[in-house]
Swiss-Prot record:
Residues 15-403 form the Sema domain. This is Semaphorin-like protein A39. Acts as a semaphorin-like protein and binds to host plexin C1 receptor. May alter the movement of host plexin C1-expressing cells including dendritic cells, monocytes, or granulocytes in the proximity of infected cells. May also regulate host cell cytoskeleton of neighboring cells to improve viral infection. Keywords: Secreted, Signal. One of its GO terms (biological process) is semaphorin-plexin signaling pathway. It comes from Vaccinia virus (strain Copenhagen). Interacts with host VESPR. SMART domains: Sema. SUPFAM superfamilies: Sema domain. Coiled coil: none annotated. It holds the Pfam family Sema.
Amino acid sequence: MIPLLFILFYFANGIEWHKFETSEEIISTYLLDDVLYTGVNGAVYTFSNNKLNKTGLTNNNYITTSIKVEDADKDTLVCGTNNGNPKCWKIDGSDDPKHRGRGYAPYQNSKVTIISYNECVLSDINISKEGIKRWRRFDGPCGYDLYTADNVIPKDGLRGAFVDKDGTYDKVYILFTDTIGSKRIVKIPYIAQMCLNDEGGPSSLSSHRWSTFLKVELECDIDGRSYRQIIHSRTIKTDNDTILYVFFDSPYSKSALCTYSMNTIKQSFSTSKLEGYTKQLPSPAPGICLPAGKVVSHTTFEVIEKYNVLDDIIKPLSNQPIFEGPSGVKWFDIKEKENEHREYRIYFIKENSIYSFDTKSKQTRSSQVDARLFSVMVTSKPLFIADIGIGVGMPQMKKILKM
């Protein structure tokens, strides 16, 4: 078994390997300002300008989070489990007394979703050891700490989170797959919205609850196949819209990538009826962002607590996936092609296979490497991150196929 850090891979020019100093298990990867941060147990590696650096931290400390908090110091933080006592450090390894570890890293090694926007930090990380999975706003100047209600967020967490403008207000959007039923399991993919500067509920018991949480189902169907398990998501901003890319898995031995217009999604949140609600909507309507200092009425909060699902289904652009791929896809990223506005190359990985889909030619190419792939991050060139090499000697790229 060969310890690896990642692969610099080009379909045209082959492969280049960069190795860990010691055998490591990759815990997390983040790309911040074109710097790759790779969290392992007890350390974080950074890679930029073809240079690899390691910062050692405490032992028994799974680094799950690398995040740039946009406060006055504009520090990049790395946060980990720290032997069951979550903690954050600056990238040079020094202590960071300004940011508590809870909410930035879990108590035990697990997959996390965390974002920072205008100094506000949000995550699906439990702040107590036995806590229920929730989506929280827990640090920064956006207002009180807020969290979702019980069982709104699935136990395995989110598959994407981002902030986007809706008129003059910032809204945070999250993606997840809900599982319904006990005898016949049904999976429903959702995108949910909340106002970033939500003031919380109107009573002392609800003041730390999101008061603008609404969700709507996403559709990704073709030829009778319905893709419903969200793997991963990305957004691309255009001149007048934000395009949401969502990779789905399915029971059909296939996966699919669907794209959605955020303008369409925002319109649905603004105008759609609430599923199961038949009365006239209160004022302000559920999900509407209010000016600073304004709190929703008791009536509005009661409605959104009981009826937070839209009576609508968001269809993808062109009413079908961009393409279908193999099942078991783990991660993907997107790169705009040089000198070709709004044409992209989409990279995705499965086990030890690498794929590239060209949105212009509609061709998919694939290759295999002697390594277990962890994730893919696109900078000026795609970085394919692997945590284990298989066999003896440096792993090789096996083949390139057109599909």
